[in-house]
Amino acid sequence: QIKAISDSFTQQYGKALSVQSVQRSGPNNATLEVEYEKAVATIEITTEASPPFKVAGLLAKGFAVKGDSIDKIKTDFGALSGTSGFVVQKLSDDGVATLHALNADKQFATGSTFKLYVLAELASQVAGGQRRWSDVVPLGVRNHSSAGTQNWPLDTPVTLQTLATWMISVSDNASTDALMRELGRDAVEGKLATIGHSAPDKALPMLTTVEAFALKSNPTLRQRFEKASEAEQRDLLASERAALSYGAINMSQLGSGPVAIDSVEWSASPQDTALLLNSLRRTNSQTARDIMAVNSGVGPTAASKWRYLGYKGGSEPGVISMSFLPQSKAGDWYASSGSWNNPAKEVDNGVFVSL
């Protein structure tokens, strides 16, 4: 499997020429910068703990393509199969300046990017005195793709800050749904109106991750949901709780390509997400921004070029989205968000990351 990953890098970026740097991040982990003929890759590598210390994990965090330019990036974005778009903005308290954009107003499935709305609402409730980051609640939720809390007992006590950190840094789904439960779906949905969203009819009702998995894996229930009005969809979510629970998810229905990415999803345009990023910049919650910076999305070498780098991504078959909130060493703030959707086949995450 690792050879297949390495071969895919070579096929796309040419031969590996040299290892430019190695930064140790743990007893068996390191981040490497590897120069290829066409790009410089940031790669996280994990070895086994005992001799002969075989490579156990290999993760590409980003590719800096040689000779890149914004015009080339736009051309490459436009050549992607399906639909794609992005926006890059400079942010200030005096206004927002769009520097570069392509299909920035088009709605895309964005996967876990919606979790930034959950973070924004949590920060608002803490700022309003309704909650504290240190408040302790039971986990109470189980779901797939929950790297932080997988197999934890349901009565495990966790702070809201811990849940938020898992939710953003490793996209933990159980943590997300626990926060949705505590904050309230209506309150999180209210962030779309407060911050601004160009097509709330496509984004509401805002599903929990369990609901999304369950709907995607149940064709009969999904078809009912797709044909329903928003009010009817809300009634369905309330009346079909057993069918929309973790135990009802049929993962065998989710392993063969994109499923309902146009109808059972979290929808936003790059411009919508840029508004959300700017709102998180302007909030008085340093804790929320610290949480966004736990996982920079690009590795420590690329992140070190910025004073601050907040990140959230989202992906599933047929969907990838990446959003950044960077602050330059000079103090200037930016928002960058891009998405790529293809309802007919899986997208190439490596290609998108390189853009």
Residue ranges and their predicted role:
Residues T31, F63, A101-T110, G148-L154, ...:
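Second-shell loop/turn segments in exported
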Residues S25-D71:
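Exposed beta-sheet edge and beta->alpha loop/turn motif
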Residues Q1-N28:
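Short solvent-exposed beta->alpha transition segments
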Residues K61-A109:
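Beta-lactamase-like hydrolase cores
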Residues A109-V137, M167, S336:
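Active-site SXXK
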Residues L154-Y246, Q271:
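Active-site-adjacent helix/loop patches that line small-molecule binding or acyl-intermediate pockets
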Residues G128-T156:
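Short, glycine/proline-biased beta-turn/loop segments that scaffold the active-site neighborhood
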Residues G62-L80, M251-L355:
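Structured C-terminal helix/loop/strand segments within mature extracytoplasmic catalytic/sensor domains
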